[in-house]
Amino acid sequence: MRNFLILLLLLLAAPLTKAEEVYGSELEGFKYPWPELRFYFTSQRQSVQMAYLELMPEKPNGRTAVLLHGKNFCSATWEGTLRFLQQQGYRVIAPDQIGFCKSSRPTAYQYSFHQLAHNTKALLDSLGIDKVTLVGHSTGGMLATRFALMFPNRVEQLVMVNPIGLEDWKAEGVPALSVDEWYARERNVTATMIRNYERSTYYVNEWRPEYETWVQMLAGMYRGPGGLTVAWHSALIYDMIFTQPVMYEFKNLRVPTLLLIGEKDNTAIGKDLAPPEIKSRLGNYPALARRTGAAIPGASLVLFSELGHAPQMQDPERFHRALIEGLTH
């Protein structure tokens, strides 16, 4: 009995395990693979900061790649692609957008893809960067599309990796939620929910130990002292994604465009809310990919038949080979 009590006390006194760690509302406590840099600016009458990663190449090719993360991702989740493009001679920049990860979550903020595009342009202006290869994944694909439509003279090439928003969910019949309803859902997010969703959507029902880092990155913010702030901004961002489609403007893109899409993806915002007859037709990425490729003038389409929503994480070698082959030189 005495030994049991001693063991129990030691366990209680032990530091939190990785699965139990909590992070601040701006991801304080979570370590990125490189020191994050900060861009301080004013947006919507508030002082804000945008965290970003920047890698400089040993043998520059004179080009800059900007990597835009998705809704459940951060700049750090681009780690493999950051390293790969740096090795290929690119200067590589990956920002955390306002409202995400290590960047500010302002007290009040009107989220729009237009605003996030302006913020990204301001970061590039501050760094003296003109033209970029713009790579957007998931929600970052919607943002990259908006940026390319607004600032086509700044984009040498647009690359979209399993972008969401290839269909208009509300037009397809998905019930619209209020921000308060999104918030109620986000307040209940757990690591188990995140893991189950990522397993089925990102990784085609496969799981590897390295994926857990990204589950805990997100879950740790919800568990932390600023968890309600994280949930509120997540609700605002979901509302932005749901109500601001970009697909109707694909035909207006005038930059070289490369689509890299895992066909096993089944992402559709609010799909769980839809009636069965609507739910069954949402997130059909084989069809959506081909339709999008046809809608964008001159687009190139590369399909990964066995991969899901995050091909750059599920099969980095194959993804990076397709990426470098598809980049204009």
Which residue ranges define each predicted feature?
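Flexible "cap/lid" loop of the alpha/beta hydrolase fold
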Residues: T145, L149, L158-V189
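N-terminal cap/lid segment of alpha/beta-hydrolase-fold proteins
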Residues: S25-L55
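Conserved serine/cysteine hydrolase catalytic core
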Residues: R223-A294
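Conserved HGGG/HGGXW glycine-rich cap/lid loop of the alpha/beta-hydrolase fold
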Residues: Q44, V48-K102, A322
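Glycine-rich "HGGG/HGxG" loop immediately N-terminal to the catalytic nucleophile
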Residues: A76, Q97-F113, W169
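Catalytic active-site module of serine/aspartate enzymes centered on a nucleophile-bearing elbow/loop
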Residues: P286-H329
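Conserved alpha/beta-hydrolase catalytic His-Asp/Glu region
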Residues: V189-F250
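Conserved acidic catalytic loop of the alpha/beta-hydrolase fold
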Residues: H114-V132
